[in-house]
């Protein structure tokens, strides 16, 4: 008689979890992450101090940053880190909420599976619930920004930064973010407005206060002049971007020269100086009056450039020079020697104005009038940790506004969408005759985790507030002329029409968050067995 071989028989020294044990193990690992980040959610959420192995400190309430700084060993929990990172790359905002919804869905689904419901039924129910949510958001919850007026854009940015460190200077940063998007606005072949946010450069300058941050229409980079005797402003500059240093030429170490007369050593030094002067002369003869290099400029080359009235900027980042070269209509030059070996420079970049300004204790290069639409946001703040968090906050706000402008569709914030979807799904579940109706009920319950955590982090009674919100929305939905956009104002603890009070966010962000959270939950709930090999077998 053939004996059935189990996973435990195959593994020697490894671990195996199957069935309900596997689901519960994954759910427990997820809850640890959930509890770690839920207090950072919302306008009144708290910050986390993350210290890495090198002792570097970062203070943030950004979900993706917190998760990336956590040491997570559990493979299932690592999916949440990937989820938040992907949300940050694709959407830019909502990294915390997408993880909270995903974990809530996994927890509810795990309980259903433990009670005897088959995982396929839970997965099918979640898919049905998600599809209904998307349809409901499109048909009933969304409004066009064209109908709401220009104030809607400011409201979107204010809602995004309300939970960020820059919320205390929301007037300043709303203006900066909106103007930055207008600077880079372009039209594609379908006559649709596009906002390539990669053309927005964000610089950090320690010192000063947050309200000293400003927008520059053009490109800015943190670099300094090679000499204080060089001009700090050039109109109609001819720009040369080079990827080599302007330093005294020296023969490579692999070259050996044998001399029988000590006086010839001086001839070798003179020849090296002549080669260096010839290179600088080639640059000057090209007509360039601004030279940007990724390397250094030594004293001799600096003297020659100053005498020729050429501005030299040293130690620029190569990525910055690639952007500047493209925006000025040239390319990054890696060598001034052409194919024949002669020194020559073929092309220069052009702009309207080149300027070096002092910001705090550092210098900043500003270039205006580029061939390509570009914008730079220069941030000021007390210390590097604050500036890092400001950069993340501005990036999130820029991404949110881009989504709003490109989709022209917004939904109310403050838990209004989640509560409305929960009520809709509860009604929808009663129309489903199959087993999936149980999973749809649990999906509806999971969505309520967002308004509950919002109110808890604001120091309010979450159960009472969410119950009042659900009853208010239910009454308004029953009344066809009533408002279905009721949400929570966490600062006052009141229930209000969040569209009317300007608490809004892009509808595409909400739908992408739901999609990502649902897909992550389904991928975890479908896991029937966890096999952990011992370290020596894993290496083999």
UniProtKB/Swiss-Prot annotation:
The keyword Translocase is annotated on this UniProt entry: no
Keyword flag NAD: no
A matching Pfam family: Cpn60_TCP1
GO cellular component, one term: chaperonin-containing T-complex
InterPro entries associated with the record: Chap_CCT_alpha, Chaperone_TCP-1, Chaperonin_TCP-1_CS, Cpn60/GroEL/TCP-1, GroEL-like_apical_dom_sf, GROEL-like_equatorial_sf, TCP-1-like_intermed_sf, TCP-1_chaperonin
Main location: cytoplasm
UniProt GO molecular function: ATP binding; ATP hydrolysis activity; ATP-dependent protein folding chaperone; unfolded protein binding
Record's keyword terms, sorted: ATP-binding, Chaperone, Cytoplasm, Nucleotide-binding
Localization in the cell: Cytoplasm
Subunit structure: Component of the T-complex protein 1 (TCP1) complex.
Summary of the function given for this chain in its UniProt record: Molecular chaperone; assists the folding of proteins upon ATP hydrolysis.
Family under the similarity heading: Belongs to the TCP-1 chaperonin family.
Database matches in NCBIfam families: chap_CCT_alpha, thermosome_beta
Protein name per UniProt: T-complex protein 1 subunit alpha
Origin species: Encephalitozoon cuniculi (strain GB-M1) (Microsporidian parasite)
Name of the gene: TCP1
